[in-house]
Design a protein with these regions (language model features):
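Acidic-histidine catalytic/liganding microenvironments
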Residues: 61, 128, 208
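Short, conserved active-site loop motifs that form the nucleotide-linked donor/cofactor pocket
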Residues: 64, 131, 210-211
């Protein structure tokens, strides 16, 4: 089954003729370089958690070539995250495309921000043994408040029943389906956040030192320390450029969320609300 994704779910620049020509050239060159092993970097997380910001921070680095939600990569990744049965159809194309993009990026290292790869990370790690993974986590209240403001992210909670259940991407299971249907949008966004939090926990056990967890609030408040930690993890010779800090985003949720919404979020995530 092919699911119908909403139009323009990707913020990346659409594919152009120049992209197709560039990749065709790489495909021809790689035919004579069968031993080439890419070492891509993948940014993982849920929507509105800071994955975009992390990619923007790394994008100017001279050693990296950064893709941010680039079609058709982002579309493939999102569809597989929502519907695992799509993996047989789409995964081979995704892996080939990553190999071509990584080869085309040389001598720079490919970094891709298609954050739903959080649900595909084990397969990516298996195929690309030198890959590294950046898992991004933001507090539940900031994530939910930002999700409610963002039409494209809010869409998923509003239209969840248009997609297969179970739905790991949204955190909907057969067991919680009926309860989810009765939830507010804030609570549904909290369900999604919790599913991604637990998935990050799972991936840390699976990927070990191939993954680093970046916390949104620490990147805001302990920027130098966190950039150095990320630089060390990625084995970058040059420092990561200093980003613009918008510290008001840490507390904005207190203005955006009502007391009822905060209570609904707490009811969903329980003690996990303290984790960020």
């Amino acid at each position: 089954m092919t699911i119908q994704l909403p139009q323009n779910i990707s913020s990346g620049r659409p594919e152009r003729l120049a992209d197709l020509i560039r990749l065709a050239g790489q495909r021809a060159r790689l035919a004579f370089d069968a031993d080439y092993q890419p070492d891509p970097i993948f940014v993982l997380g849920t929507g509105r958690s800071g994955t975009h910001w992390v990619a923007w921070i790394l994008e100017p680095h001279s050693a990296l070539h950064t893709l941010i939600e680039k079609p058709p990569i982002f579309d493939w990744v999102t569809e597989m995250a929502i519907d695992p049965t799509a993996e047989d159809r789409l995964m081979p194309s995704l892996l080939r495309r990553y190999r071509l993009e990584a080869a085309s990026a040389r001598p720079k290292r490919l970094l891709d921000k298609s954050h739903p790869n959080i649900w595909l990370a084990e397969k990516l790690a298996e195929v690309f043994p030198a890959a590294r993974f950046i898992g991004v986590l933001r507090d539940v209240f900031g994530t939910v408040a930002s999700s409610l403001r963002h039409e494209g992210v809010r869409y998923w909670a509003e239209n969840w029943d248009a997609y297969p259940v179970p739905n790991r991407f949204l955190g909907v299971s057969e067991e919680n389906r009926d309860a989810y249907a009765q939830m507010s949008l804030a609570a549904r966004c909290a369900v999604r956040w919790r599913a991604h939090l637990h998935r990050l926990d799972e991936l840390e056990a699976i990927l070990g030192d191939r993954m680093i967890r970046m916390r949104y609030h620490e990147l805001q408040t302990e920027t130098n320390r966190e950039l150095l930690r990320l630089q060390t993890f990625l084995e970058l010779d040059e420092p990561i450029p200093q980003p613009e800090i918008k510290s008001d985003s840490l507390e904005r949720w207190k203005k955006d969320l009502s007391q009822q919404q905060i209570a609904e979020i707490r009811a969903v995530v329980g003690e996990d609300a303290q984790r960020s």
